[in-house]
Amino acid sequence: MIDQYKHQQLRIGSVSPQQISAWAKKILPNGEIVGEVTKPYTFHYKTNKPEKDGLFCERIFGPIKSGICACGNYRVIRDKKDDPKFCEQCGVEFIDSRIRRYQMGYIKLACLVTHVWYLKRLPSYIANLLDKSLKELESLVYCDFSFARPVVKKPTFLRLRGSFEYEIQSWKHSIPLFFTTQGFDIFRNREISSGAGAIREQLADLDLRILMDSSLIEWKELGEEGSPDNENEWEDRKVGRRKNFLVRRIELAKHFLRTNIEPEWMVLCLLPVLPPELRPIIQIDGGKLMSSDINELYRRVIYRNNTLIDLLTTSRSTPGELVMCQEKLVQEAVDTLLDNGIRGQPMRDGHNKVYKSFSDIIEGKEGRFRETLLGKRVDYSGRSVIVVGPSLSLHRCGLPREIAIELFQTFLIRGLIRKHFASNIGIAKSKIREKEPIVWEILQEVMQGHPVLLNRAPTLHRLGIQAFQPILVEGRAICLHPLVCKGFNADFDGDQMAVHVPLSLEAQAEARLLMFSHTNLLSPAIGDPISVPTQDMLIGLYILTSGNRRGIYSNRYNPRNCGNFRNLKNERIRDNNYKYTKKKEPFFCNSYDAIGAYQQKRINFDSPLWLRWRLDQRIISSREVPIEVHYESLGTYHEIYEHYLVVRSTKKEIRSIYIRTNVGHISFYREIEEAIQGFCRAYSYDI
């Protein structure tokens, strides 16, 4: 469809019978209305022309050849209103044959049929709205049970009898044996409804606003009646399931009201017929014909529907049970057309091959949407395997030179001509083919101000496509920061991603303002952080920050393992900023000295050390008792706790505090500190 702003869009949902009829009906100059498919035939076996009122009828779906009717007459297609648009003999419209790609037909069903998607798919929308079990509804739809139709202000046999515990009853128990055939027909037409007609009556009687109010009241009552202190766990679970059902029911009713969809539209009286070009019959070598499975399923529906029409119109003495069985066959044929195999064993052809139904055609990776509509190749796009780029910023991606020079070739040519490195397009292209050094310089300048879009199929939510600032990398793989993988549902085991270049200024502005990866840190569904460390990152952080499990007690009880340094000499090593011995953990005045010692290979990254910290009283716990106290000759003493050390003067004043850590912790802390400072700096610039 096309909205009022001329934007092409696709909307999927329930439609009214009037809308289905409007899609298909055409009025001929003689006043005849065409659009209904009544015959299960396709092409005549002698003339190879479409059968009239069949599945490929030219009157309904348009001419096979542009401007040529079924009689063979030709007329130039013009826009003049005076020219006749229909052939007077065959009724075929003189129009472009491409109309057979979108002109629809319809089948007028002799009985009402439920749409199997709304009945059998989970959750069942019909069962949720009617607040009935799916098993009961299936028995009603497939004519195994009957439904007592309420007759307003009239005494009925079923009401007078008063022996029914449930609204839906079995035929054997609801019909007395003394009814004759004629009496039974009167009784059935007046007081009993079965099949999809019973479902439609109940859906039509629903008031969605009253349904929402009653469901909300029941939900509140269940919340007040909950058992305190989990006295009855089984009842609590039962109440919880009922409350969840009521919430789903309210949301479903809201959706119907918001979209102006009537619940009874989930029961079909008109079945749309797809355009012929979407279910073709083609001729292969040897004169044989290949047909789409949809055609065979449509034929099955028409055959059974015509049989039911004959039973209802020509044979008035037909037993009601036979009519009900035929209605059940029509329901099953429509179910097979819409979703083959949803009720059990799928329908197969003569070669034991399962027929592809409408659901099979549109769903999945090879379906109409993902393969035909979403899987098209477009210009200014590329594709490659993704690999990890841990040194990249969150909003950057590494683009291989081979891909970048092709994607940005137009911008590159313009840059070479503007800076007078090439006088025309031909010379610029030759420089690009030869990959001169100036080409890479211009390419980097072009890429600095141009974001790219990365997409990983399937795009199930909006984080499946995000914007990045590209940089040139060696190799043939796209480099990606590991933290953005969760939004794409990607990993580095061979996944591929597509890269697209937004061309217009509007697209580039939208990419920068809305789609950059560092602005999409929360899940749009539940609001939880989505850029969180996983897998290899968690293992790396664990190894980086893991120290001795026994902590400060390791040296006390394992004196042989207290040599934490690679310097095996026993002599005391002194420096201006730190001191350490073989049997003592080193002391450092700042983190730079600790990292310098690690770079000089004098300590390991997991070696415990004491790092001087600012005088922060929050580190000291008032209830914690020191493990050891070391006194020195000048009167100062060290209070050693599990995670920190306090140096006090003779007056018990705190002179300095050391925390027990290792180089891994220090490196991790510095990375976080630099990231926070960079964020604060960027935020202050924005203000």
UniProtKB/Swiss-Prot annotation:
Its cofactor is Mg(2+); Zn(2+). Zn(2+) binds at C69, C71, C87, C90. Mg(2+) binds at D491, D493, D495. One of its GO terms (cellular component) is mitochondrion. It catalyses: RNA(n) + a ribonucleoside 5'-triphosphate = RNA(n+1) + diphosphate. Keywords: Chloroplast, DNA-directed RNA polymerase, Magnesium, Metal-binding, Nucleotidyltransferase, Plastid, Transcription, Transferase, Zinc. Binds 1 Mg(2+) ion per subunit. One of its GO terms (molecular function) is DNA-directed RNA polymerase activity. It is an enzyme of class 2 (transferase). In plastids the minimal PEP RNA polymerase catalytic core is composed of four subunits: alpha, beta, beta', and beta''. When a (nuclear-encoded) sigma factor is associated with the core the holoenzyme is formed, which can initiate transcription. This is DNA-directed RNA polymerase subunit beta'. The gene is rpoC1.
